[in-house]
């Protein structure tokens, strides 16, 4: 078993978000050709529902899902789903970059709609995992923790760097 886990399905780093690859418990590579958060949510939901018999339904389980998006560069529909981008594409920059310290004329500001679309898509994918817990009758006896490894400055403080800075926007999650 991979790292002592009965079930392992791991993101294979440095992928395009709509063309990711993964490694499973047996070391098999998977290339699903779909936006990674939606794929990962489906895999997690299948595990929760025990669709493939990967866990003992009478025993508690631990499931960790680490989605890569939202992750820079947020430049195109390759980084998000069209339905999520549609929520933001026509909004003026002042409605997207609402922090008082946002510098709205930075080059990075052009990526704001793609960034927020990616965030919305991750929210939707996470909702699918929560729905699977509810459908499986596990919500009363399950602890769910949502966390992130860093924030995003998104033009705040006048920096292009999303995370490698000492600012609250990049450190708070």
Feature-to-residue mapping (PLM):
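Active-site-proximal cap/lid insertion segments
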Residues: 11-34, 38, 48-173
């Amino acid at each position: 078993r991979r790292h002592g886990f009965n079930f392992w399905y791991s993101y294979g780093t440095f992928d395009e978000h709509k063309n990711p690859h993964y490694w499973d418990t047996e070391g098999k590579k998977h290339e699903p050709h779909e936006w990674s958060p939606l794929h990962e949510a489906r895999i997690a939901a299948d595990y929760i529902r025990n669709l493939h018999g990967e866990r003992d339904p009478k025993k508690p389980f631990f499931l960790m899902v680490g989605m890569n998006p939202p992750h820079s560069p947020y430049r195109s529909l390759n980084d998000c789903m069209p339905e999520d981008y549609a929520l933001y594409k026509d909004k003026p920059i002042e409605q997207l970059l609402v922090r008082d310290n946002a510098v709205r004329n930075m080059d990075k500001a052009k990526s704001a709609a793609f960034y927020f679309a990616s965030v919305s898509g991750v929210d939707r994918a996470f909702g699918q995992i929560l729905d699977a817990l509810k459908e499986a009758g596990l919500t009363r006896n399950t602890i769910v923790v949502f966390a992130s490894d860093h924030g995003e400055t998104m033009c705040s403080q006048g920096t292009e760097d999303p995370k490698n800075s000492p600012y609250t926007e990049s450190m708070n999650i």
